[in-house]
Design a protein with these regions (language model features):
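Short active-site oxyanion
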Residues: 31-34, 61-63, 97-102
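Short, well-structured N-terminal submotif of metal-dependent ribonuclease cores
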Residues: 1-37, 46-60, 124
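Acidic, metal-associated active-site segment
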Residues: 45, 86-102
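Short loop/helix-cap segments at secondary-structure boundaries that form the rim of catalytic
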Residues: 56, 111-117
Length: 124
């Protein structure tokens, strides 16, 4: 994998110490990858209290991708091309496409629909 993006489902899985996300991240870190966490995914899981501690530690080893105007417009076009796609998923998917990343997600079907063939979608 060229890179790894974590969506909200992956962050929640990490928060819950799910072994699948731990394995995915272990592989990424051994390969020297710095996972990307889209800011919109972080916004979906962050609560601003003690429950965020595990995710906060993970973020120290990740790159948080801001939602730029360019990304927002591209995600809007992707939503238009993918009926039923959600805004957050489209923002995440566009970044994955642009970077050529694999994605760790619990939202397999929607991400596959948005990303199309050729993108590695890892279930958490």
């Amino acid at each position: 994998m060229a890179g790894l993006t974590l969506d909200a489902g992956a962050l929640i899985a990490y928060e819950r110490a799910d072994p699948r996300i731990r394995e995915i991240l272990g592989t990424a870190f051994r390969r020297g990858l710095v996972p990307t966490v889209p800011a919109v995914a972080l916004a979906e899981v962050w609560r601003g209290d003690a429950r965020d501690a595990r995710v906060a530690r993970l973020l120290k080893a990740c790159s948080v991708e801001p939602l730029s105007e360019e990304l927002a417009r591209a995600a809007g076009r992707l939503r238009r091309e993918t009926p039923g796609a959600g805004t957050v998923d489209a923002c995440i998917a566009w970044g994955v496409r642009r970077r050529g990343d694999a994605i760790a997600t619990s939202d397999i079907d929607d991400m596959r629909r948005l990303l199309g063939p050729g993108v590695t979608v890892l279930r958490v």
